[in-house]
Amino acid sequence: FAVLMGASRAFYGKYGDRISLDRFMVLSSLLCIASYLGISLLGMPQLSLVCCALCGLSVGIMWPGTFSKAAAALPKGGTAMFALLALGGDVGCSGGPTLVGFVSELFGGDLKKGILAGVVFPVLLLLGVALCRKGKEE
């Protein structure tokens, strides 16, 4: 997970000037959705483990991409904007696992059900990128 997350960030760092951030984030969101579905629905633990690694690849750009998009959209956002982004990140880093844990507990400790519920987060990111695109076009 961590190695592929770092590889994703390094790839975008090297080739980002040639790649659309929106497109990269959309493709990463789709890969993240697919990896969450694979983790939660595949019956072979080995394939679920591969999906966990792919999840790392898919999430690598999400946090730095969000910062880049925010800085581009609000160039005078300053310290307050980054403080709010950090707060949002903290809420997400605690809220996501909390949701997964609650759903898992509702299903008798079935972590696969919790991970399946967690698919809502990359779906929300996908919707957010689409809304930003739509707002930019108008």
Locations of regions flagged by a protein language model:
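Residue-level signature of mid-helix packing/kink "hotspots" within the transmembrane helices
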Residues: 2-10, 93-94
